[in-house]
């Protein structure tokens, strides 16, 4: 498949893509939302957002612009980058930016929401990076509900910001890095104006596709056979 379409309550589009080094787009900030109100496992009301997962940014962009007319006005956007990315070589491609403190040291959704609200009172776009998602353990909130050991197992999945983006009606793109189960998360305020800058930033953060996995899966699709020549 070239494209996956799914719903995201608390990270169900963002994190499958991130854990598999795929690209994703969450459209909660541009009204790609369900009208049904639900409650999360930690008692937060939300309606599910709609998003896309793809192997490349071009396919993702085509899907988004097919559904959403780009209404972006020519204006300047204030971009914040978490300061743990100051030495990141890809971040150097973004010239107009401000580094801010990465104080997301809790997995608590309310705490994350409060901190993001403070950031988006001043900035339009935030760039973060989350790593080793669902690699050491599986971060499912149902699993984490069975005592302290299962809660720690859930926490070891390293999920943070992606758990609240839909609940806050934000728009986001994930761009995989060259490390396993790791991606940049580019997050924007609610509004159609941010579609273009989100994709422009995403294009600046792209790594070359892993050639071995590309050859493996392309050969499988073309020949219906997982055996290929190295």
Roles of regions detected by a PLM:
Residues 1-64:
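Short glycine/serine-rich loop segments
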Residues 4, 96-99, 170-174:
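Conserved beta-strand scaffold positions in the cores of enzyme catalytic domains, especially
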Residues 6-9, 27-29, 55-57, 82-84, ...:
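Fold-independent oxyanion-binding glycine-rich loops
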Residues 14-20, 37, 91-93, 138-141, ...:
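Short acidic, glycine/serine/threonine-rich loops at helix termini
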Residues 36-43, 66-74, 172-179:
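Short, flexible, solvent-exposed loop/turn segments with mixed acidic/basic and small polar residues
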Residues 61, 117-230:
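Glycine-rich, small-residue loops and helix-cap segments
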């Amino acid at each position: 498949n070239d494209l996956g379409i799914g719903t995201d309550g608390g990270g169900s589009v963002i994190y499958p893509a991130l854990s598999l080094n795929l690209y994703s787009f969450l459209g909660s900030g541009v009204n790609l939302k369900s009208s049904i109100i639900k409650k999360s496992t930690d008692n937060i009301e939300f309606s599910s957002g709609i998003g896309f997962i793809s192997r490349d940014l071009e396919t993702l962009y085509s899907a988004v612009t097919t559904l959403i007319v780009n209404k972006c006005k020519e204006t300047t956007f204030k971009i914040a980058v978490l300061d743990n990315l100051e030495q990141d070589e890809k971040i150097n491609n973004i010239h107009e930016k401000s580094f801010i403190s990465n104080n997301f040291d809790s997995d608590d959704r309310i705490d994350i929401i409060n901190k993001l609200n403070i950031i988006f009172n001043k900035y339009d776009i935030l760039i973060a990076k989350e790593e080793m998602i669902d690699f050491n353990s599986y971060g499912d909130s149902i699993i984490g509900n069975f005592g302290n050991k299962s809660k720690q197992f859930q926490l070891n999945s390293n999920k943070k910001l992606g758990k609240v983006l839909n609940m806050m009606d934000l728009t986001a793109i994930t761009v995989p890095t060259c490390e396993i189960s790791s991606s940049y998360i580019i997050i924007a305020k609610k509004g159609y104006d941010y579609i273009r800058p989100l994709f422009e930033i995403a294009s600046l953060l792209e790594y070359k596709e892993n050639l071995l996995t590309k050859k493996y899966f392309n050969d499988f699709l073309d020949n219906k056979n997982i055996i290929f020549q190295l």
